[in-house]
Amino acid sequence: MAKGKENRIIITIECTEAKKEGKPVSRYSTTKNKKNTTERLLLKKYNPNLQRHTVHKEIK
């Protein structure tokens, strides 16, 4: 049996700037190690609706 696979979980990140502007949000799914990164993840990703890179925040 594989050891240590239970620490990495799949999360969804959502654009924060599109919500403020009233435009459709973009969502990405990625993985994170919950042992090393306990706080919410913030990444800069491309939002095709706004046609620019924006801050994406982890959602539950």
Curated annotation (Swiss-Prot):
Keywords: Ribonucleoprotein, Ribosomal protein. The keyword Mitochondrion does not apply. GO terms for cellular component: cytoplasm; ribonucleoprotein complex; ribosome. Coiled coil: none annotated. It comes from the Bacteria. GO terms for biological process: translation. InterPro entries: Ribosomal_bL33, Ribosomal_bL33_sf, Ribosomal_zn-bd. One of its GO terms (molecular function) is structural constituent of ribosome. It holds the Pfam family Ribosomal_L33. The keyword Cell division does not apply. Belongs to the bacterial ribosomal protein bL33 family. This is Large ribosomal subunit protein bL33. The gene is rpmG.
